[in-house]
Amino acid sequence: MPSDILVVAALGRPFTLGMLYDARNDKLIPGFTLWEDEVIEESTVESSQPSSAFEIIASDSIDDKSSLMDIEASLKASFLGGLVEVGGSAKYLNNQKKFKNQSRVTLQYKATTNFKQLMTNLGTKHVEYSELFENIQATHVVIGILYGANAFFVFDSNKVDSTNVQEIQGQMEAVIKKIPSVEISGKASVQLTSEETDITNSFSCEFHGDFFLTSNPTTFEDAVKTYQQLPQMMGKDNAVPMTVWLVPMVNFYSEAPQLMADSSTPILRKVRNTLEAIVQVQMRCNDALDDPTVNLFTEVQKKLSDFQIICDDHMSKLQATIAKKLFAIRSGDEDESALVNLFEENLQSPFNIESLNMWMEFEEREINVLKSCMDILTKAKPKVIFNQGVLFKELYDSKVKHGLCYVFTNVTKNDDFLTVLNDFLDSPQSRPKKLRPSPKDYWYSYDDIPEMMREKAHLFRNLAKEMNNRCVHFFVTAINNPKQEGAGIHYYRESIQIIHEFTKPHMPGVETIKDRRELQWYDCELTLDTETAHQVLTLSEGNKKAVSGSTKSPADHFEKFSHFQQVMCTKGLSGRHYWELEWSGHVSAGVTYKGISRKTSTPDSSLGKNQKSWVFEYTKKSGYQQIHNGKNARVTVSSIGFKQLGVYLDWPAGTLSFYMVNKAWVTHLHTFHTKFYEAVYPAFLIGDAQQKVNGQIKLL
């Protein structure tokens, strides 16, 4: 063969002997051959060239992929510039990792079968000249083809933490290396250890090959079975062009176009590095879009999606320009300085890779700030609602007396640098407003605002822990408000916003409280304890209601009151708590330490008659009284026979207050001032057998 021969990888393209080829843009010219079919057939020499090999790589770079497929630098540049449309196994070149934080290992099976070439002394003999032929833009003609087949098994892990990528990749590689020697049992199942099975279950498989399969493998076990079938599927009839030898057309037709020059290795390396760097940015963007936090914040999701589209458009335009420059250089119309200038212009544009990576760094920081806040906030178990219409519907619910809303105030889809990129795409000759994103445009680029946001998130969580009740509801949302940096805790009272920087409820002195909603900050839902209830008390309605007068047979339990008709609640309380009850008849309501005596008929067992209990009482005989340690005092009430009693315990302050409840208002009745030493239990005395009076209560 002549010394100026050109050797190129077939890349799934349908080469045949005698076919014409334009090396300036690496395009086949189908439908035309230099010689008649009969002449080609007579002049073809075929030789057997059987071989097979397998190789494993843990890289996803275009260099390593090209090396596996024997692609030289010039053809690689054409592929990167979008000049070459690949097919068959070569589609592997287009298969890129979706995420940067993802492990990938590729197994290649390669086989060759035979080599065909045209006789070197064919020369211009039998060349078909015509006017049509003179207009065909071909620089070379195919004179040799090596046949065979490639198969690529691409194994990908799920997205993982960045610190685990290498470790998981190593585990994958160790297992995949065993594929050629893995045994398949008589039941056609792959024999693996339990540890190997755990590893292989964690990754997927994608197949690119020159073999016809009824179904492509998607799992490790599928891949093993397919791999072991490939040698039997290989043969001359199933082989495809792998490598192609071409000679210049000027050897046969002096007026034919020529491949005048090609770009130097440093320039081709710059092509590769620039395009691969953009791919790396796109993978970072995919990583970010896959983050669960981003799925919550649609504004962030929109920015990342817009950035991804902009990068795709930039990549397409850059590839198209590279393709034009490569063709011009190879045609001799321009020298390689045209490509040099292209990349210099790119460096001086907003699309320089440093700026794109800087934007991604800013966006990743925003995501991390939002994620760190959400990690704190979710411990409060709030309703996370990013639709403002749905949020305000929740706030209008009559059950929501108090709404506390942690609001992200600076999360927006607007981004000045994205606007700059978009404008530059539309008008690349215009002077951009900026070449790179500026930290001052991003609130999260400084530490003080994110730190403040986390402090407010901790406050929000503590409020939720302290006021976990039916009347106070907690929400998380995002409402853009440039006047409030980072975040705020907005307070809504019965759907109306009261404060946008809430820290704690404002509680007046317990004796002066009039608005029932102020007490409902500390609403407490209680349940009566059946194990403590005296035998004559009947509990119902989910142990919320107790009525005296039953004639049940006694049941012995060490916690049960056996003399006084009393019952305690299940939950011991410290902190601040408010509860309400409906009451009628002979009733005492208050709190007691758990250690109150249960079995005697002495004051030690009677609510209010000892140091361990405090009660507010109503009897028909004595009226309203407050009682502690056996000392009682009458309490004047403006509405005799009122039906609803409110009780507010401020354990840290040492107060226990009682209120008459009338719809939205309360009237203070009495406050005990003491020092509590342990949790107290709401407790009730209901009826009196000796006085033959009954009573009932219902916890609200």
Curated annotation (Swiss-Prot):
Residues 506-700 form the B30.2/SPRY domain. Expressed by the venom gland. Gene3D superfamilies: 2.60.120.920. Keywords: Cytolysis, Disulfide bond, Hemolysis, Secreted, Toxin. One of its GO terms (molecular function) is toxin activity. InterPro entries: B30.2/SPRY (IPR001870), B30.2/SPRY_sf (IPR043136), Butyrophylin_SPRY (IPR003879), ConA-like_dom_sf (IPR013320), Cytolytic_pore-forming_toxin (IPR052090), PRY (IPR006574), SNTX_MACPF/CDC-like_dom (IPR056072), SPRY_dom (IPR003877). Its main location: secreted. GO terms for biological process: killing of cells of another organism. Not glycosylated. It is found in: Secreted. One of its GO terms (cellular component) is extracellular region. Pfam families: MACPF_SNTX, PRY, SPRY, Stonustoxin_helical, Thioredoxin_11. Heterodimer of alpha and beta subunits. Has hemolytic and lethal activities. Its hemolytic activity is inhibited by anionic lipids, especially potently by cardiolipin. Belongs to the SNTX/VTX toxin family. This is Neoverrucotoxin subunit beta. It comes from Synanceia verrucosa.
